[in-house]
Amino acid sequence: VDLLFPETTFDTLNLKACLFAIQKYFKDHQVYLPVMASVTITDEAGRTLTGQTIEAFWNSISHFHLLSVGIKCDLGVEKMRPYVEELSGIAPIHTSCHPNAGLPNEFGGFDQTPAEMANLLQDFLSNQWVNILGGCCGTTPDYIAAISEAAANMPPRTISSVEPLMRLSGQEPLTLRDDSNFLMIGERTNVTGSRLFARLIRNDEYEE
């Protein structure tokens, strides 16, 4: 095994559990391999299946030492464009892109040719948004060969320099800066401030 690649993440919680297990294995067995990770954007709103934005996704896993982070499967090259660009600007590590060969047709096949896909990816290459390119659904060795040829003489992405700030996330990202106002998180779970919440905790009614 040369590296590990938890990929096509729909739910960031699953990926975090996977990365935790990998980290524990490395520690327990005194080994280390490079780890890549990727996410899938499931619709044109730019969110994962569980509702996270690209920036929120990155904030959720940025504590783990990764070789790269990227977008995989997804909506095809053209509709991935804004999310690949965004990830390139916020991740201070290598970025990757493994698109489908367009969207599937009504028969479950893919109509986009290797040349068409490679031509669309030229935009990503010329803008230096990616360090690693590949393919996902619908791609074959012919597609990978066309992508490789398109990328052969292009300069790789320069890794972004990101200001060191506290970056949190739920479905949306939250960045705390020196000039941020006072921020209170989880005040509704304060047993001293809410009689209702205190009663639920005392009675073990955690699902209420």
Tell me what each language-model feature is:
Residues V1-E208:
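Domain-level signal for soluble alpha/beta catalytic cores
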